[in-house]
Amino acid sequence: MTHQDLSITAKLINGGVAGLVGVTCVFPIDLAKTRLQNQHGKAMYKGMIDCLMKTARAEGFFGMYRGAAVNLTLVTPEKAIKLAANDFFRRLLMEDGMQRNLKMEMLAGCGAGMCQVVVTCPMEMLKIQLQDAGRLAVHHQGSASAPSTSRSYTTGSASTHRRPSATLIAWELLRTQGLAGLYRGLGATLLRDIPFSIIYFPLFANLNNLGFNELAGKASFAHSFVSGCVAGSIAAVAVTPLDVLKTRIQTLKKGLGEDMYSGITDCARKLWIQEGPSAFMKGAGCRALVIAPLFGIAQGVYFIGIGERILKCFD
């Protein structure tokens, strides 16, 4: 294995490890974010803490980890692609010690955002259905006779009321809609992830460079971690309106009286008219609390060089 192959493999391992650790730590907050963004009209949850407490009471501790399995399975390739792609595009666009260029860094971030959606879109499509299942169950309690506009995951003609699984949802989507079913909301995902990467990667690089230590040849672990957290939280809040649109569009099953959306423009228009401009920032705090440690951990893993250490064991 050449040095370049070793470097790429190490980066993929680092991205995967960072994703697994990060998701395990912050998944309940991500679940709260999805449920807060999806509630229409009369609020079922007053905020993140209220959502987590009600979820724990109604569904138990593991109810807060609904959808975690699909995320843990796919977050490794997703984060690995995102971080490795950004690194690749940075090297491609800024060769031979070229001075830092904000435009080139933003282009590299754009490339990373475009690459990652291959995994991100189906992963979040499945995750959102599982995360929102508990909220929908409460919505429908005592309203079994009311007409519903939501889709059901069925096997045969009778509707099943069992807890949905990622495998069942994926199979139903593929059977009824083909591959396009798993990539529902692809445009909204691109619209969120490309701006996020354009903001995050250049911001992190410049913040991290402020703590560069000439003796060590890099910034300290603490500085890299904080830089990742700050850049991640700023980028996350900045694209929250786009994340709200993506979540609403990708949610297949709706509560009673909740709208279906034909696309990004239709979703934005209905959201503005029915819920007001503040609806576009639903879950912003949760999103910052999810993304900040995710990317702080990612940069910390890169700093420690876990991938390089693992590969050395096989030399």
Curated annotation (Swiss-Prot):
Residues 141-160 are annotated as: Disordered. InterPro entries: Mit_carrier, Mito_Solute_Carrier, Mitochondrial_sb/sol_carrier, Mt_carrier_dom_sf. Expressed in brain, to a lesser extent in testis, and poorly in all the other tissues. The modification Phosphoserine is found at residue 145. Keywords: Membrane, Mitochondrion, Mitochondrion inner membrane, Phosphoprotein, Repeat, Symport, Transmembrane, Transmembrane helix, Transport. Its main location: mitochondrion. Gene3D superfamilies: Mitochondrial carrier domain. One of its GO terms (biological process) is L-glutamate transmembrane transport. It catalyses: L-glutamate(in) + H(+)(in) = L-glutamate(out) + H(+)(out). Residues 142-159 have a biased composition (Polar residues). The keyword Membrane applies. Solcar repeats lie at residues 6-92, 100-210, 219-308. GO terms for cellular component: mitochondrial inner membrane; mitochondrion. It is found in: Mitochondrion inner membrane. The chain crosses the membrane at residues 12-32, 61-81, 106-126, 185-205, 225-245, 288-308. This is Mitochondrial glutamate carrier 2. It comes from Homo sapiens.
